[in-house]
């Protein structure tokens, strides 16, 4: 089997979710390192930390592909003053490349939000919110994306049954909600991560429920018996992103070793 360069893996990811799909504030794509080396393995994760770089070293991976960019804002210096800079230094010392697939992967057909919908068993998937039309720089073809995904359950379910389904599928102990709907739920709109900006779009699209990772206190008000709000946690909502990344790499770069990170990088703790 032929060797595969790191650049080929990153190119495959960016063909699937072109960088022009990302939000203007984002910093997806190559973050650290040189890409001409043969890939020894790809470690797939949500966040890059020093422990994740150590994991890549221990597993023989010279490429880390994260969902969230390690470098989100410009660095004024690279020293040891914070975890971002220390992580960059450690990666460079060990010839490890870091790339991120963030809002471009959220917005792509078959991306993060599609994976969430798949886990819930939704049918008739389509985008809601803003529709994005961009040109794929690699192919020159027009690509469609969107902010969130909406779909239907095969059979409607009660609000409390939806809560139980979310707890089971995303392995969470609790779900934050507004008042439970007294009607059945068939159509659900969703957005992994911080998706509260799409609540009004979900209502306009006719959704019975809206699922996301986080919302602020005041955003829950005023929607009683209008739409079922379900908030499961930012990290929890995006936990299956690594499966999306693995599927892309295994399809386009067969033979490349893919390792799903075993480190829980969720910075939020839950105590009971």
Predicted regions and their residues:
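Hydrophobic structural segments
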Residues: 1-272
């Amino acid at each position: 089997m032929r060797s595969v360069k790191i650049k080929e893996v990153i190119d495959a990811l960016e063909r699937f979710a072109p960088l022009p799909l990302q939000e203007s504030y984002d910093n997806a794509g190559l973050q650290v390192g040189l890409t001409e080396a043969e890939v020894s393995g790809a470690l797939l994760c949500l966040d890059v930390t020093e422990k994740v770089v150590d994991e890549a070293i221990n597993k023989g991976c010279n490429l880390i592909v994260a969902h969230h960019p390690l470098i989100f804002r410009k660095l004024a210096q690279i020293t040891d003053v914070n975890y971002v800079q220390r992580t960059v230094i450690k990666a460079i010392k060990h010839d490890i490349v870091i790339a991120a697939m963030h809002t471009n992967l959220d917005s792509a057909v078959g991306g993060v939000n599609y994976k969430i919908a798949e886990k819930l068993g939704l049918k008739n998937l389509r985008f809601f919110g803003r529709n994005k039309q961009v040109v794929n720089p690699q192919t020159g073809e027009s690509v469609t994306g969107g902010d969130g995904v909406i779909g239907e359950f095969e059979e409607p379910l009660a609000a409390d049954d939806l809560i139980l389904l979310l707890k089971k599928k995303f392995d969470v102990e609790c779900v934050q909600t507004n008042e439970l709907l007294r009607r059945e739920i068939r159509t659900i709109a969703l957005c992994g991560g911080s998706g509260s900006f799409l609540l009004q779009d979900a209502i306009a699209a006719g959704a019975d429920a809206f699922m996301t990772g986080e919302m602020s206190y005041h955003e829950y008000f005023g929607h009683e018996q209008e739409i079922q709000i379900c908030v499961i946690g930012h990290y929890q909502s995006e936990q299956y992103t690594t499966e999306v990344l693995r599927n892309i790499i295994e399809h386009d770069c067969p033979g490349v070793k893919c390792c799903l990170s075993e480190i829980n990088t969720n910075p939020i703790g839950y105590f009971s």
